[in-house]
Each structure stands twice: as structure tokens, then as C-alpha cells.
Amino acid sequence: KSFAVIALALLSGTLFVATPVSAAPATPSGAARTAPWNSETTELEADNRIIYGRLPNGLRYAIRRNDRPENQVLVRLAFEFGSAAEADDEQGLAHFIEHMAFNGSSNVPEGEMVRMLERLGLSFGADTNASTGFVRTQYKLDLPKADPELIERALFLMRETASEVTFSPGAVDGERGVVIAEMRDRENYGFQRNRAASELLYPDSYFSTRYPIGKKEV
């Protein structure tokens, strides 16, 4: 089977979904077709197989058919916000919020989101993950099959990630330890080499002053 790539985006981000053509939704109710998002910032010719649009709430989307992978659904939610936007006393908060997104939300009990994903057949890490960069934070779900109910549940969880994440004191304290452990793991030769190169090549830019991993004291 072939599948459609669906990209849904907030004004500050993008969500990508890949589904079989038979499961690809029609243009959402109330949505408006738009020109390609980056048509004014690139000289590359737009792919006319991609359908772009915007929902009434500002969410942007793009849909494209493809042939691989077969009968799978790939979901990507990307916010155009990362460590470069942080103030001195906020370094690492974008990355920390990314971690908290998997803890719980207004409609998903604390600690239940990962278990919910596993019940849907996803493996945490391989099929469910997230990353924070200098200018973008991205979440991913790779669904094992193109089941409409599974797609609906995945989009529900992405909606929770976009606007309903909760920050209970206990969950924050617990995740702080996880992030600190990640900091220790990254203090290796490769990371130190890259940091030294960034400080040499870009001494006054966020590439050398706003590492996504953040600072322990923050």
C-alpha cells in the first residue's frame, strides 16, 4: 500500500503523520488551503503533490502520498522553539519541558502516557521519542499499523503534548534526576570536542552559549 504524509503544524511548529492512502483524511472541516509554508523563504520549486493548509486554530498541515513504509503511520510534532530562545536563567527549560511531555497531561494521568503508548504497540525509544535542538523541539510517534482508531489516539496524545502538559511538583522533581543523569552521560569526549569547536567558531552565538541540554543549576 502507499501512504500519505500528513504534516500538522502550530504557528510555532509542525506535526508530520504518514498513513496509507486509504486512511488519509480529507481536508479537515473548517481548514483552508494555503501556499507552501516556506514558499517565501526558498527558491526551491514546491512539490505539487503536497497539500498545505491551516486549521481555524492556526494549526498548519501538509499531506502527501508516498509508497514507503508500507501500512505504517509516522507522526512528528515540531515546535519552532528551542534553547536559542532561552534567557540566561532559563537554560535547559525547553529540553526539560520536552521530558515532561511524556509524564502526563490534563487528560492523561501522570505516568500513564508511556504505558498508554506501549498498549498501542509502540516501543518507548524506538517508536516514541523526542528531541530538543537550538531552534526546534520535536516529538515522534511511529505507529505499527494504519488503524484509524490508533491514528486518532496518536493525534490525541500529540494534542495533549501541544497544550495540556502538567507540571506537578513530584513529577518535576523526578524528571530533574533523569535530566541530570542525561547531562552526566553527555559529558564525554565527543560532546566536549563539539562544545570546544562551537566556542571557537561561534563565540558570540547561541551555538556556543545555549546548549539544549541546559545547566544543572537552572
Range-by-range predicted roles:
Residues 21-26:
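Boundary at the C-terminal end of the N-terminal hydrophobic targeting segment
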Residues 5-18:
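Bacterial N-terminal signal peptides
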Residues 1-2:
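Positively charged n-region of N-terminal signal peptides that target proteins for export
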Residues 74, 194-198:
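Short glycine-rich loop/turn motifs
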Residues 36-78:
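Mature N-terminal segment immediately following signal peptide/propeptide cleavage
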Residues 69-70, 79-193, 209:
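Active-site-adjacent, His/Asp/Glu-enriched structural segments that form or flank metal-binding
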Residues 30-53, 139-142, 199-218:
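Histidine-acidic residue clusters that define the catalytic metal-binding segment
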